[in-house]
Swiss-Prot record:
A motif ('KMSKS' region) lies at residues 618-622. The keyword Transmembrane helix does not apply. InterPro entries: aa-tRNA-synth_I_CS (IPR001412), aa-tRNA-synth_Ia (IPR002300), Leu-tRNA-ligase (IPR002302), Leu_tRNA-synth_edit (IPR025709), M/V/L/I-tRNA-synth_anticd-bd (IPR013155), Methionyl/Leucyl_tRNA_Synth (IPR015413), Rossmann-like_a/b/a_fold (IPR014729), tRNAsynth_Ia_anticodon-bd (IPR009080). Its main location: cytoplasm. PROSITE patterns: AA_TRNA_LIGASE_I. It is an enzyme of class 6 (ligase). This is Leucine--tRNA ligase. Belongs to the class-I aminoacyl-tRNA synthetase family. GO terms for molecular function: aminoacyl-tRNA deacylase activity; ATP binding; leucine-tRNA ligase activity. It comes from Shewanella sp. (strain ANA-3).
Length: 859
């Protein structure tokens, strides 16, 4: 055995073995319990970053652990390869998105292999290939036939100069990223999938996701946003028109003093015909944001329409205002405004001198709305026949009255909106719909699928090549001329079903149901919590669509979800001559000084610039604080990087990248290597005989089996990989101090090392593979079994008791494991050191903590 640990040499050899033996390629096996482990697949941006490495190391640890449990483990990988970044890169590099993407895939694939991840590469998929998106297109046509797909106009960001649609990321400070023209909102026809048809089931089934983090489940519940309320009809004074409003607080209905409608509401547009101020306001609103986050913080503005609404119960007239905080695509585009009991309505009323009336008061205490609205539930007053009712009583009484008079109905609403899947981009899967010469829109016939996206294109940075090329859209259906849809799918479409395609990636159908139902649902899914409300909801939705199409049997796509934390690194910058910040890579910082609390007080880069330290921040290009995994692998080896990733932090929390920690992980592996090397060099022919062990040898063996028990639980149940590593490190300290003089000494070390390399195999597989062979095992470590705890080794013959006198440790005594308190007290009092401290004093109290501590209080 080599005395020195040489990571680059052993990692290359082990990876070649895995490749040549197709170690991680799997097929369905009815005789073995399956385990499907999946990490969210990467976008092929060009290089792996440390966030990828953390995600994929966690997945690999879980997969390898389950393999040694004897399970049939599937761990696939692929590429989420459509998307806007490829278009931008193609424009900048004067190429097309396809070659840029495929080149990146090859580079990143080699990076993944260097890190030693145990993937079944035979199942690799790239979502930008027709072999993949063909089935997505096919499925979309089936959803259309089931009535789950429809087209309607929706608002997009529009650059009037380039005459093109912009993604949200391409709008910078309200202007086009390319030409700096102010961006407008434009209504264009787009395709939608009816996720709202599954809202109730998506919400209810959250309760079945026992293996998902509570935070993700709460976020999804809030995103779906089920509410019970009343939809009521308000008339419009002086006309036969009416409009609907939905509220979850009908108890406040008697306090309505005005109604707010969206700028795009038909009533606002009607009133604007004779109201120039309103017409101008509507135009301004067309070009403003529609995101909820921005609506919450922006200035609330409005214009009186001159119209009045008729209260559905009192008949009282209240003014109708057009307001910028009401959106047409949320609810009915109109809200009843109760400034006495809603803070936004209150602030708007104060701004525009509108009446504020209180109709709810606290059950106990005084009502005060002089400074703010009273928004809690309480008891009704100033509400006529409803005075004295609490929230529930008022809800029911008011709802019943509205229903009886034909002016309202009880209704369950959802915050969730249907999924708009149209994108006016090029680099995505073409939407498989065509428009016939007579204007009829139909799905692309199955025998014409896939609708292939042309890859040999020129990107001008303005218009999608398939929109610019009028010939591409021309096709024929059943002998009739037709035009193809030139929008492409939202890239969340591809990532909503990739997990299922892995089960049968070469199948000449969307899924092979037999294979899909063997592997699905995913047993362990791993990815960032930032995907909680988009990808992870679409992922669940698509699974239910697949189920209802008869392709899968299960209700949910993944049993367990682990959301790993971000990777942080130090961030430094200096200010250049032009006053701009120049961010410097931590690898280029040559001098740092720290105070006594470890805080950086001074930093200088390799060019001599004195730097400002901004603390630990998420690794990012913008702050230039990303650490290239490949550089670290070349310097320390893949196993060291993997070990640091698992040891530095619990998986759900942020991980602070510290090269000193990486060096520590590297030293630990070298210690393990040396211990194994020293052991192998000796005569290890004597077999372990537990009947011959001394108490010291039994104690060491007990530590070995306690460690096996802890690591098994930490990885398998708790998923606390950091404490699993810490337990092995602690055991290593015991092993390094242990004598290796007798045959039984060495037999215990041999048993320990054989266990340790398997315990660490999921985390540092190259080292473990090599040491397993060096320790004389004839089978491959991948074909071995996870170490089993010898329960008899955990039984203690004796216990070490700490003896304190007046709170200070004075002695340690060994007692029989089953010794009672009287025996322990007698032995403790008889100890020479204890006698010395009890001389001339009176024992007042003796406290015994069984098996651990004897505390004597004396004065």
């Amino acid at each position: 055995m080599q005395e020195q640990y040489n990571p680059s040499e052993i990692e290359a050899l082990v990876q070649k073995h895995w490749h040549d033996n197709k170690t991680f390629e799997v097929t369905e096996d009815a005789n073995k319990e399956k385990f499907y482990c999946l990490s969210m697949f990467p976008y092929p941006s060009g290089r792996l970053h440390m966030g990828h490495v953390r995600n994929y190391t966690i997945g690999d640890v879980v997969a390898r652990f389950q393999r040694l449990q004897g399970k049939n483990v599937l761990q696939p990988i692929g590429w989420d390869s459509f998307g806007l970044p490829a278009e931008n890169a193609a424009i900048n590099n004067k190429t097309a998105p396809a070659p840029w993407t495929y080149q990146n895939i090859e580079y990143m694939k080699n990076q993944l292999k260097l890190l030693g991840f145990g993937y079944d590469w035979s199942r690799e998929i790239a979502t930008c290939t027709p072999e993949y998106y063909r089935w997505e297109q096919w499925f979309f046509t089936k959803l259309y036939e089931k009535g789950l797909v429809y087209k309607k106009t929706a608002s997009v960001n529009w650059c009037p100069n380039d005459e093109t649609v912009l993604a949200n990321e391409q709008v910078q400070d309200g202007c086009c990223w390319r030409c700096d023209t102010p961006v407008e909102q434009k209504e264009i026809p787009q395709w939608f999938i009816k996720i709202t048809a599954y809202a109730e089931e998506l919400l209810n089934d959250i309760d079945t996701l026992d293996g998902w983090p509570e935070q993700v489940k709460t976020m999804q519940r809030n995103w779906i946003g089920r509410s019970e309320g009343v939809e009521m009809t308000f008339g419009v004074a002086g006309s036969d028109k009416s409009f609907d409003i939905y509220t979850t607080r009908p108890d406040t209905l008697m306090g309505v003093t005005y109604v707010a409608i969206a700028a795009g509401h038909p009533l606002a547009e009607l009133a604007a015909q004779t109201n120039p101020e309103l017409a101008q306001f509507i135009e301004e609103c067309k070009n403003s944001t529609t995101s909820e986050a921005d609506l919450a913080t922006m200035e609330k503005r409005g214009v009186a329409t001159g119209l009045y609404a008729i209260h559905p119960i009192t008949g009282k007239q209240v003014p109708i205002w057009a307001a910028n905080f009401v959106l047409m695509n949320y609810g009915t585009g109109a809200v009843m405004s109760v400034p006495g009991h809603d803070q936004r309505d209150y602030e708007f009323a104060k701004k525009y001198n509108l009446p504020i009336e209180a109709v709810i008061k606290p059950v106990d205490g005084e009502l005060d709305i002089s400074e703010a609205a009273y928004t809690e539930k309480g008891v009704l007053f100033n509400s006529g026949e409803f005075d004295g009712l609490d929230f529930d009583g008022a809800f029911n009484a008011i709802a019943d009255k509205l229903v009886a008079e034909g002016k309202g109905k009880r209704q369950v609403n959802y915050r969730l909106r249907d999924w708009g899947v149209s994108r006016q981009r090029y680099w995505g899967a073409p939407i498989p719909m065509v428009t016939l010469a007579d204007g009829t829109v139909i799905p692309t016939p199955e025998d014409q699928l896939p609708v292939i996206l042309p890859e040999d294109v020129v990107m001008d940075g303005i218009q999608s090549p398939i929109k610019a090329d009028k010939e591409w859209a021309k096709t024929q259906v059943n002998g009739q001329d037709a035009l193809r849809e030139t929008d492409t799918f939202d890239t969340f479409m591809e990532s909503s079903w990739y997990y299922a395609r892995y089960c049968s990636p070469q199948a000449d159908q969307m899924l092979d149901p037999t294979k899909a139902n063997y592997w699905l649902p995913v047993d362990q899914y791993i990815g960032g919590i930032e995907h909680a409300c988009m990808h992870l909801l679409y992922f669940r939705f698509f699974h239910k669509l697949l189920r209802d199409a008869g392709l899968v049997n299960s209700n949910e796509p993944a049993k367990q979800l682990l959301t790993q934390g971000m990777v942080l690194a130090d961030a430094f910058y200096y200010t250049n001559d032009k006053g701009a910040r120049v961010w410097v890579s931590p690898l280029d910082v040559v001098t740092t000084e720290k105070d006594d609390k470890g805080r950086v007080t001074k930093a200088i880069d390799k060019d001599g610039n004195e730097l400002v330290y901004t603390g630990m921040c998420k690794m990012s290009k913008s702050k230039n604080n990303g650490i290239d995994p490949q550089v670290m692998v070349e310097k320390y080896g893949a196993d060291t990087v993997r070990l640091f990733m698992m040891f530095a932090s619990p998986p759900e929390l942020t991980l602070e990248w510290q090269e000193s920690g990486v060096e520590g992980a590297h030293r630990f592996i070298k210690r393990l290597w040396k211990l194994a090397s020293d052991y192998v060099a000796q005569d290890n022919s004597e077999a372990l005989d537990v009947s011959k062990l001394t108490s010291e040898q039994k104690a060491l063996r007990r530590e070995v089996h306690k460690t096996i028990a802890k690591v098994t639980d930490d990885i398998g149940r708790r998923q606390m990989f950091n404490t699993a590593v810490a337990a092995v490190m602690e055991l290593m300290n015991h092993l390094q101090k242990a004598p290796q003089t007798t045959g039984q000494d060495r037999a215990i070390i041999g048993e320990a090392l054989t266990a340790v390399v398997r315990l660490l195999y999921p985390i540092i597989p190259h080292v473990s593979f090599t040491l397993w062979n060096e320790l004389g095992n004839t089978n491959s470590i991948e074909d071995s079994q996870w170490p089993v705890v010898d329960e008899s080794a955990l039984v203690e013959d004796s216990k070490l008791i700490v003896v304190q006198v007046n709170g200070k440790v004075r002695a340690k005594i060994t007692v029989a494991a089953d010794a009672d308190q009287a025996s322990v007290e007698a032995l403790g009092m008889a100890d020479e050191q204890v006698i010395k401290y009890l001389d001339g004093v009176t024992v007042r109290k003796v406290i015994y903590v069984p098996g651990k501590l004897l505390s004597i209080v004396a004065n």
